[in-house]
Amino acid sequence: MKRQTIAFLIQPFKNRLLPPSVLRDSIDRLFKELIDLMNEFPHLRLSCGLPAYILEHANALNLSKVRDLFKRDAIELILTGYTEPFLSLSPTVLTRENIQHGLKVFNELTGVIPTGYLPPFSNWEPSIIEMLREIGLTYAVVSQELFPSNIKNSGGYWTAEHAGKSISIFPSISIHQTSAPADMIDWIEKINKSGSAAENDRLLTIHYLFSLDPLREAGPYRWLRFMASELDKHLLNYQPVRLCDAINSSQSRGFQYIPSSMVTEAHGQADRHFLNYLYSCDQAGILQRKLVDVHDQLTLQTNQKTVPALRKQLFFIQDINRLFPGRESGFTLVSDRMWSFGKMIDIESSLDAHQAPEGGKIQVTDYFRDGGKTVILSNKHLKVYIDHKKGGQIFSFDHRDRSLNLASAYTPDLHDPPDIVSSGRSRTWFLDRILPSNASGNEYAQGTIPSLSNFYQSPFDYKVSAASGGVKVIMIRNCSYIIEDRNIPLRVEKVFGLEKNSSIFSFVYQLTNPSLVPVNLKFTTELNFSFPSCGSTDLRVFHGSTVHENPGWQFFQLKDVTRWAIDDRCGGIRIHFQTQKPVDVWFLPPAPVTRHSSPNQGLTMIIATEINLSPSANWKNIGKLTCRKLKKPGNHHDVC
């Protein structure tokens, strides 16, 4: 009986942000264990999937020994890219550059150019076939879950085709360190019984994933050694091969069309509607649109000296581990989300350094790429993104001096239907509401006070203005609110502005009563802050000599104030607030949502004012917030 052919693919992954020193130690151990394993079991053949930046942090002596393994055809390296790009969410040009740069690094450091591609999370796009073939890659490896149920266990490899272009594609059985079988041979035999491969053509591709994080995973190499020992004992029955050798020694089993899909867990099912889920998550669409926008700006850059370094940073930002939610990584984690925004803010600041107008800059653009317009105000220190279609709310507020998007608070409440900014669900800035005049902050925090208006669901008319003193946008809406089933007309005008070359953001509200009857109401506007220190004692609220530590866990309020401040010692920033007229300021605990919510995902602050308007009268309040830098602890996050 012919021996069964087994292609064993290992993929050490880095899904969490790690300090460079920790990553280097983990990489050194990876290559040392791999070299020792291959020397101890000379009949073993392995394929190893890696992002190219891992090689840049490897010890030179270890790389030299790995090159010796290449020479004796014991191991092959398979490419994920320079990083692990999210194919479905990234600009195609950026993904191509990522993969090409990865090939270049592999060639420079190992002397070998990979011929295989390993899409992270089996994130597959049919349109990538043409690109992979053009840059010299001849095969790809994806989870067998992407294949039709009647053939996914058939073994071998197939030919995937799209628009006349084709590539060899291996269906793999994915196992994680935590789910690796205790009896390797018995596990393989059970797979064989469930499969449909012909007796003389039995290629099984096993994809073993383990983490490079020494704090999260324990003992992945022990199981690797166990696997190698078991295969070595049964060499008469099982023949280990590299994937590149399997293509040369066997024929494709036929053609298969693999649609756009993704597998998010080792034993999960292929999800062909994963982008609908992704755009249902708060902040996901904003991150993606900012990535696309920054890439477009970089593409137009004429200063070629700065482009390669900035593009390399974008490779890390488009990494799927930052852009897809997971238990240990992804934009749902405060650290990952703020890291991604921070890196993109740094790139934008570098690009704007030589072209920012003296008084500031105004852009009116289709930022969401949905046919609408977004107003963007910016200067050297701040950049503000305003969605006039949904109540004139601010969905991003970049403090460039500290590389912080202060409006990137997150809620686990999903957007339904999927949308980039969801009215009433997204945790943005300046969400305006009208409440009954006797409403208290504590009652509102408990959810017992309904809103009488829908300002954040409707568009405002707008006009922009630039002068030597700064830039501003004026938004106006004739609307109404409801009291006892009666529509009460109201005119709302709000102005946002940036002062020239300063970290001062100003806001003005004017409410006009066009009716012939007096009105009495409580007007509120909500701001959701994202600080690195949210949920910890490093975040404090100041009012005069009073200090409130660790806000966000329970309700508290400041009454009749015109000045207060928020300190974030971890982020190194203090925000001073000032209003012309006294206001009440409410700080709310996490909203009760269907899933777990935590104070570290954002701080909700509401500015509330009771207003009495006579017929044809108006009310106006002017405010500003000033961002100032504090001493900041050192940043040791990640390799980018």
Model-derived regions: residue spans:
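Beta-strand-rich recognition/accessory modules
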Residues: 363-370, 453-456, 463-493, 502-506, ...
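Acidic (Asp/Glu-rich), glycine- and aromatic
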Residues: 391, 396-402, 411, 486-490, ...
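Acidic-aromatic substrate-binding/catalytic surfaces of carbohydrate-active enzymes
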Residues: 25, 93, 97, 380-467, ...
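An acidic- and aromatic-residue-enriched active-site/binding cleft used to recognize and process polar
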Residues: 11-13, 51-53, 82-85, 111, ...
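Loop-rich catalytic cores of soluble enzymes, especially ATP-dependent carboxylate-amine ligases
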Residues: 138-196, 413, 531-582, 587, ...
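Active-site and substrate-binding clefts of carbohydrate-active enzymes
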Residues: 2-29, 39-41, 156-158, 163-167, ...
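Catalytic alpha-helical scaffold of carbohydrate-active enzymes acting on polysaccharides/glycoconjugates
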Residues: 1-115, 122-169, 185-202, 221-236, ...
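Buried hydrophobic-core signal for structured, non-transmembrane domains
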Residues: 314, 381, 386, 508-511, ...
